[in-house]
Amino acid sequence: MRMLMVGAALVMMTSAAMTFGAMADDDDDAKGAQKLAMQGRDDYWHCLAREYSRDSNQGMSEQDFGRSVAGACPSERQYYRVALLDYLTAQYPNIDAGAHLATANRAVESAQKDIVTAFVKHRPPAK
């Protein structure tokens, strides 16, 4: 009987350790996904900043600059979108993937809108 209780205790401790290990792995995965999403965001923003500061943008209208920004940095934009999607999926696995994709797309659109807003606010006045 005593061996049975020791065996049961070992099974329970092993199960608890495995569950904790899985939770720690999930936490590590989420932290890694968050780090990649933040890196993707930073890379995309830096690329947009390079686009913003090009001399060829001088004299562009807001609409033309907006179109230029929308097509700029395709690899950085896609990496940011995918990394953010991965992070959201890891962080909120019970939410529909379509909702995560919509959120990632809104984040990309927001970055583009912010760059266009900065362009409009800081361009020299028309002569």
Model-derived features with residue positions:
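Compact alpha-helical subdomains of small soluble proteins
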Residues: 63-127
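Charge-enriched, low-complexity helical/IDR scaffolding segments
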Residues: 24, 48, 107
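Short N-proximal segments of mature Sec-exported proteins
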Residues: 32-83
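Positively charged n-region of N-terminal signal peptides that target proteins for export
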Residues: 1-4
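Boundary at the C-terminal end of the N-terminal hydrophobic targeting segment
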Residues: 19-26
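Bacterial N-terminal signal peptides
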Residues: 7-17
